[in-house]
UniProtKB/Swiss-Prot annotation:
Main location per the UniProt record: membrane
Subcellular locations according to the entry: Cell membrane
Organism: Symbiobacterium thermophilum (strain DSM 24528 / JCM 14929 / IAM 14863 / T)
Protein name (database record): Fluoride-specific ion channel FluC 2
Family of the protein in this entry: Belongs to the fluoride channel Fluc/FEX (TC 1.A.43) family.
Protein keywords: Cell membrane, Ion channel, Ion transport, Membrane, Metal-binding, Sodium, Transmembrane, Transmembrane helix, Transport
Known regulation of activity: Na(+) is not transported, but it plays an essential structural role and its presence is essential for fluoride channel function.
Residues annotated for Na(+) binding in this entry: G72, T75
Catalysis: reaction(s): fluoride(in) = fluoride(out)
GN (gene name): fluC2
Function: Fluoride-specific ion channel. Important for reducing fluoride concentration in the cell, thus reducing its toxicity.
Transmembrane in keyword set: yes
GO biological process, alphabetically ordered: cellular detoxification of fluoride
UniProt xrefs under Pfam families: CRCB (PF02537)
Amino acid sequence: MAGVAAGGALGAWARHGLGSWLTALLPSTFPLPTLMINVLGALLLGFVAGYGIERGRLPEAWRLPVTVGFIGSFTTFSTWSVDTVLLLDAGRWPLALANVGISLAVGLAAVWVGRRLAFRWRV
């Protein structure tokens, strides 16, 4: 459990740092930083699932700290949900719908790509 907590702390710290940097770099009415972080997290989880878990390269003791702890706290469904509701409240329903559609499509694609990369990795 301590490993999951440590992974969670590191993931939250990484998410905050990257989110702040992306927000300053890419100011927009669309929640692009949240989308980018969630897609990166989906890619990472797909890779870890394929390379680390399915191919047995990640020791059992590291699986939960990396997946549930780090990647789970790095990505965030709640921030994505709030971003979408705020767009709806502001009357920007086309952006809200785009956020939902793009996040779902690109997130699933990122997991798929991550797994494909994992199975091509030769180590």
